[in-house]
Curated annotation (Swiss-Prot):
It comes from the Bacteria. The gene is truD. This is tRNA pseudouridine synthase D. GO terms for molecular function: RNA binding; tRNA pseudouridine(13) synthase activity. It is an enzyme of class 5 (isomerase). The active site is at 96 (nucleophile). Pfam families: TruD (PF01142). Keywords: Isomerase, tRNA processing. PANTHER family: TRNA PSEUDOURIDINE SYNTHASE D. Belongs to the pseudouridine synthase TruD family. PROSITE patterns: TRUD (PS50984), UPF0024 (PS01268). GO terms for biological process: tRNA pseudouridine synthesis. It comes from Marinobacter nauticus (strain ATCC 700491 / DSM 11845 / VT8) (Marinobacter aquaeolei). GO terms for cellular component: cytosol.
């Protein structure tokens, strides 16, 4: 917790303490993200020559590689190039600006198949087009299967044996699945705004106030995420974050879960419900937001399991880490369980 913020924004780590420090995002090339939506088509496109459009449907989906541009900026530019509304451009998730990212965008272009190659050539002057697919519907958040990461950490400090042990632990056990601090705004500013919301304004059926309503949803989401992190922190502290406890809803193979608070609170029961409500009741300013909303309570896995986890020391202080995460999980959260990370992109201007 910073001196200027009332909000805890750094939560307990699985090993009790971090093993060292590291610099993150020294350059965009040190943080590579590859979105996987249609693996077979992505592999076929990578192995072939010029990009051809496959499939049928009203939406042209383009797999683009971008550096130094955030997702929403690219979506707006694509709408202008394609001559469609911004609303008609879809994507599966927001990707960092300060990175090299490969992700899919969908453009609503019914009956314009003959012009696809011309548009792709124009788009390709801005961002390399890696694959193209015609599809029956717009891409939406969370449609993708996974995100692959290749991250280079520089100026790594800490005892090598402790760092190696921590890497082994991440590979075998995973990391606490905290929401990343970017969701909460600078020094928790989104949470400060959340406690000032009139909960009735979050009811979508009572009218929409444009940008103001959109901001309220952002702040509401920040509150929900912070309460989840608080419950997860309690589970990490008592070393039960990898266990399914009595009173948790049926996990359906998801392992232990925590609450995404909603109308009625939590889906847990018994002792687990008592634990979760106790944590949330300690934050009455946020808890009241959920008393008059129609958001259903949900669950989120407590553990982020990085798949295909591997690492390589490029020199004595430079570490390359590669892994795959499910949608909604954060690479910086996984690495932050082991390292105190200094994000050098924060010192650069945002678009």
């Amino acid at each position: 917790m910073s001196e200027d913020s009332q909000w805890l924004l750094d939560w307990p780590v699985s090993g009790g303490a971090r093993a060292g420090r590291a610099e993150l995002k020294t350059s965009p090339e040190d943080f590579r993200v590859t979105e996987s939506l249609w693996p077979t088509r992505e592999d076929d496109a990578a192995a072939s020559g010029p990009v051809e459009v496959s499939g049928d449907g009203e939406h042209l989906c383009l797999r683009l590689e971008k550096t130094g541009d955030n997702t929403e900026y690219v979506a707006r530019e694509l709408a202008a190039l394609a001559g469609c509304r911004s609303f008609d451009v879809g994507f599966c998730g927001l990707k960092d600006r300060h990175a090299v990212t490969v992700q899919w965008f969908s453009l609503y272009r019914p009956g314009q198949e003959a012009d696809d190659q011309a548009l792709m050539a124009e788009v390709g002057q801005r961002w390399p087009v890696r694959a193209a697919v015609r599809h029956s519907r717009k891409l939406r958040r969370g449609d993708h299967q996974a995100n692959g990461f290749e991250i280079v950490l520089r100026n790594v400090t800490g005892q090598r044996e402790l760092v190696e042990a921590g890497l082994e632990r991440l590979a075998s056990q995973g990391a606490p699945n905290y929401f990343g601090p970017q969701r909460f705004g600078f020094q928790g500013g989104n949470l400060d705004r959340a406690v000032q919301i009139d909960p009735s304004r979050l009811n979508r059926k009572r009218g929409r106030a444009g940008r103001s309503a959109s901001k309220n949803v952002l702040y509401f989401s920040a509150a929900r995420s912070w309460l989840f992190n608080q419950v997860l922190a309690e589970r990490v502290s008592n070393r039960t974050w990898t266990e399914v406890l009595p009173g948790e809803p049926e996990p359906s193979g998801a392992g232990p879960t925590g609450p995404l608070w909603g109308d009625g609170g939590t889906l847990a029961s018994g002792e687990q419900e008592t634990l979760e409500r106790g944590v949330v009741d300690a934050c009455p300013g946020l808890a009241r937001l959920f008393q008059s909303t129609r958001m259903k309570p949900e669950r989120r896995p407590l553990v982020a399991h990085p798949g295909e986890f591997k690492w390589q020391w490029l020199d004595t202080t430079t570490l390359r880490v590669q892994f795959v995460l499910s949608p909604g999980q954060y690479a910086t959260t996984v690495l932050g369980d082991l390292f105190e990370l200094e994000d050098l992109s924060l010192s650069r201007d945002n678009k």
